[in-house]
Amino acid sequence: MKKTKSINPEIRELIEILKERDEKIWKDLAVRISKSKRNRPTVNLSSINRHAKSGEIIIVPGKVLSYGKLDKKITIGALSFSEESKKKIKNSKSDFKKIKELVKEKPNKIRIFG
């Protein structure tokens, strides 16, 4: 794999944690996160709402933005969230977490968006 270009120590630590995991999905996520900031995806809530199923765990290797509404109960993990998206996620009784927290929980069925 390429060397990490990020100078953010939190992201560097997350990439190292993901690389140590045995599952292929975590290694894929490490590659996506190690991209430059402008090449990481930004995903709107409307897109997540359209493609996700209730009860699902979604990971965004970038930022979650607030455009649209969320009417399903899902768990969203991302590197960052806009303040408005956090409010909308809370109002829909869904849950949002940093990717590092989700990795520690070791979820079984996850989907990567973006």
Regions found by a protein language model. Name each.
Residues 1-114:
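Extended polybasic, low-complexity segments that bind anionic RNA or targeting/receptor surfaces
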